Amino acid sequence: MNNIKKIGLSALAGSLAMVSANAVDYTMSGEIASSFQTAKGDTGSTEASNGKGFGTETDLTFTAAGELDNGFTVDMLMGVDTAGALTNSSSQVTLGMGSLGALRLNHIGGSSANAIDDVTPNAYQEVWDGLSDGSNPSFFGSLNSSGSIEYRSAAYEYAGVGISGTLLYDPNSGLGANAPRGVGATSVSGQSATIKLTHASGLEVGGGLEEVDDASGIVGITSATNQVTGYVKYAVGPLSIGYQEAYEDNKAATGTVGGDQSATMTGIAYTAGDLTVSYGEATLTQEAIGATAATEEDFDSIQAAYTIGAMTISAAVSETTGVGGVAAQTFETNTLAVSFAF
């Protein structure tokens, strides 16, 4: 029988009681990204997005990390979006417990479910980036995130396969984090779970499940909802490929088009030194209900990125057909971007 082996097993010194931190390290990092984009739609609502222009966004990330007397670690992350009004765009606190895993409080974003909404390889951005009309194939992980608590297992190895998983509870699904000592008005809870299997050959298989118990009190969600996703990725040398599917079951949306939806995403990327090129496709399907036929929206994108030290130059040519479920409606964008990490 194979023994289960712990990867990176760390000894926990002293009592398990939580006590004061010995030392804290503070760091700040950031990114500046400027882009020029053209956009063109041929019919209907897409014409409102036609045009061209320059844009710049600046993101700052602050982290603090310390170790407790018993060997546990505490990490805090806060991301700040400075593109417009100063906004806290990401914030999490993580208690690392060595071989016991970690507990994370997702104040703003940061859930493991949301992190696997689209894992297909790309050189610049997800295939649907800049093409979405309000819905896109990466809907998985959107129900439970901010204001949630999550357990993340340590990584284990069994028969040469790395195994890890997460469990999340959100007491106010879809509403975001509460103010300090605040409570949610609806108290509609949700749960999420993810699993990931990795192998030294470069193969990775994973998936997740997300649900809202009773969403009748959530604005924009009219019933209990389940979401599920699964993906396969394989990397060998400079080549990486990925395939992912997702499905949303809106249990009480009988007679309503758009109640259930499904998505498929495919990507392939090749890296030669500092240059990466990729091609991706995705399809978002609003499932048929009764006599109403299903509608499809297709996305595709060709991308390239070249890195020179802290600078990355990226380009993307992207298109979607069937915008909003209308087969004759198309929308396309061309993007040239340069970013600096510091």
What are these regions (language model features)?
Residues 1-342:
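Outer-membrane beta-barrel proteins
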